Amino acid sequence: LNAGHEATVNTLGNGLHALLTLDKSFDEIKSETENINDVVEELIRFDSPLQFFQRYALEDVEIGGHNIKKGSKVAILLGSANRDPRVFKNPDQINFKREIKDHSSWGGGIHFCIGTHLARLELGVSFNHILAKQFSLIEEPSRTGAFGIRGFKELLVSS
């Protein structure tokens, strides 16, 4: 279970921070969402802990007018794709009723996250418990600065 541990932990931290900095109470959030899965998917889209992956091109390909040669190392910017305004209406806003739920945080194809179902379950249970209480930030947290994994050094909250 270690492979997905950091991603799930940082999704919880990023998601809790996003919930606490919204201009809505937890009660308002609960009243406008029918399914905790909508909360999970929108929070991981909004602030994905895994911002990018490196891959190697398996064949020559042209993307957006750029030629990429077979064997070239490429960076897949998942966090950027999740904020693409050509795909998501108002991508920099949290919308738990978002019609398009197909984001890139879980990867795709042969690289789709094998632990997705477990992570969704863990995140759903956790956010259900979080939304059942009232929390507030004690102080604004600082990011870890880790390359590739987006999260906080610590997230101090009170209930």
Regions inferred by a protein language model and the residue ranges of each:
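Cytochrome P450
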Residues: 1-159
